[in-house]
């Protein structure tokens, strides 16, 4: 699967997305669980800056990969996969999910939140990035599967089970949503048991 292989940018993208999603979760969680004024505190600003630079760096890497595929006129197998991503049947996952929610909206909401000193905009950026990261992983998995490993491979066998066309089934969506709900529930229970809000302090102040 050529789309799944690459040079230095591939492992860097995985590490960067892990940092981005972690910062986004912490930022959204901290803003959402803080019973205080909407003015961001030091921890909010630090997480927001980490998220901002991470998103910009990720956007630069993805732009380079897209330019690389476009400059080859989509002629390589990896280029064909990129063409499927940007203009295929699920183009909205890339343009709305990955570009809009992962790259554009977080940058503007973070800058707006820091300028207006309103942590609610920072919380929105965290939630937006979490959804965008999910869309980014869909763009990594599905196009890599639907593009044949070499030309005419999809014509060698004619059977529904051997088709390269793929989209998650209802069962797969249900399992994913169910596991996500269990993880969120476990987190909320642990947070309540540890009485998180009474012991987390930054600079000697309760946050």
Regions found by a protein language model. Name each.
Residues 1-125, 132-135:
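Long, contiguous internal "core" modules enriched in hydrophobic/ aromatic residues
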Residues 115-119, 149, 181:
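Catalytic-face loop-and-helix region of soluble metabolic enzyme cores
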């Amino acid at each position: 699967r050529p789309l799944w292989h690459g040079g230095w940018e591939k492992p860097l993208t995985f590490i960067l997305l892990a940092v981005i999603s972690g910062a986004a979760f912490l930022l959204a969680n901290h803003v959402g669980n803080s019973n205080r004024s909407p003015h961001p505190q030091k921890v909010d600003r630090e997480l927001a800056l980490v998220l901002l630079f991470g998103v910009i760096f990720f956007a630069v890497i993805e732009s380079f990969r897209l330019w690389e595929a476009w400059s080859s006129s989509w002629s390589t197998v990896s280029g064909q996969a990129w063409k499927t991503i940007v203009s295929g049947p699920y183009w909205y996952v890339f343009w709305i999910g990955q570009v809009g929610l992962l790259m554009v909206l977080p940058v503007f909401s973070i800058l707006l939140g820091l300028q207006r000193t309103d942590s609610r905009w920072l919380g929105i950026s965290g939630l937006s990035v979490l959804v965008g990261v999910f869309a980014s992983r869909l763009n990594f998995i599905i196009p890599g599967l639907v593009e044949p490993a070499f030309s005419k491979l999809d014509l060698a066998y004619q059977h529904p089970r051997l088709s390269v066309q793929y989209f998650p089934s209802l069962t797969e969506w249900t399992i994913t949503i169910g596991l996500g709900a269990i993880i969120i529930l476990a987190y909320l229970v642990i947070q309540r048991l540890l009485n998180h809000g009474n012991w987390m302090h930054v600079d000697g102040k309760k946050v």
